[in-house]
Amino acid sequence: MIDDRKLQILRAIIQDYISTGEPVGSRTIAKKYNLGVSSATIRNEMADLEDMGFLEQPHTSAGRIPSSRGYRLYVDRMIEFERLSSEEEGLIRSSIIDGTLYEVDKIIKQTSALLSELTKMTCIVKAPSVHKSFVKSIQLLKVDDVSILCVLVTDNGVIRNTVIKVKSVPISEELIKISKIITERLKNLTIEQINLEVISNLNRALSGYEDIVNAVLPALYESLKGDETSEVFLEGTINIFNYPEYNNIHKAKEILELLHDKKSISELISDSDDMTVKIGDEIFVPEAKECSIISAGYHVGDRSLGTIALIGPRRINYSKVLSIMTEVMKELNETLKNK
């Protein structure tokens, strides 16, 4: 059991280390923080905190730094969210574009760029493969006498446009009718569910327009095919170099290789809808043992769709980063609510 004085000292050490990046000694805490105890008492408490696993001593320093366990206690029991400035709040509101006017993937990419800019961390987006998306609607529009623009909209808001060639393009009224029938027959199906029976039924429903059906379906397949695993993309990879923890060329190379390994990155990120913070030893990928990862889910309508995460060293300003992440995800999910 950790008492209140130890908690106060641990909080002071973590806040000082986050601010300076330098190991913290008892004299520093005694001078900078009004804790009402002597340097000797603080030194003894720090020794106890180290024995309890909340502090570590770097080999080359007499000072102490927080361990993963220390950061975890700080995040769980001591953190106070930093109030965002009016400029930051305004930037968040203005940067997440109107969800009724743009594709979901564009909104997510813009949001990841915003998070990377505000936190100075690397942002990771884990989204389900388009391969797993459901058809929401298909609209056919005349381009010329032998060309039709096929506009596919999926349930997660992704829009794909493909031009198909046919013998002769029907009049607009017929195209509207064909679009409606195709949408009715394919709605809420994934590419894997569009089997021979579905195709046969569609051809019967659109007798006389088989050439259009036979052109639309391959176009649909091309739009939705792809890797069956989650899609992962990064924003702000260069932000890693903002931290002295990665001044060491070996560590920098290791983290960059990790960031470009999509399978490993996908395993790093929690699929929980809730805000999740993983620190150091809680991360089961060896190359990320000295990192922190903050992640949260995003939704389209009522459907949980993907995860946005921030990755950096253990020494980050949790108060500020969690405030930014909370506000951005709130704004994002509100924007996507009616998609």
Curated annotation (Swiss-Prot):
Pfam families: HrcA (PF01628). It comes from Clostridium perfringens (strain ATCC 13124 / DSM 756 / JCM 1290 / NCIMB 6125 / NCTC 8237 / Type A). Gene3D superfamilies: 3.30.450.40, Heat-inducible transcription repressor hrca homolog, domain 3, Winged helix-like DNA-binding domain superfamily/Winged helix DNA-binding domain. Belongs to the HrcA family. The lineage of its organism: Bacteria, Bacillati, Bacillota, Clostridia, Eubacteriales. Negative regulator of class I heat shock genes (grpE-dnaK-dnaJ and groELS operons). Prevents heat-shock induction of these operons. This is Heat-inducible transcription repressor HrcA. One of its GO terms (molecular function) is DNA binding. It comes from the Bacteria. SUPFAM superfamilies: GAF domain-like, Winged helix' DNA-binding domain. GO terms for biological process: negative regulation of DNA-templated transcription. Keywords: Repressor, Stress response, Transcription, Transcription regulation. The gene is hrcA. The keyword Membrane does not apply.
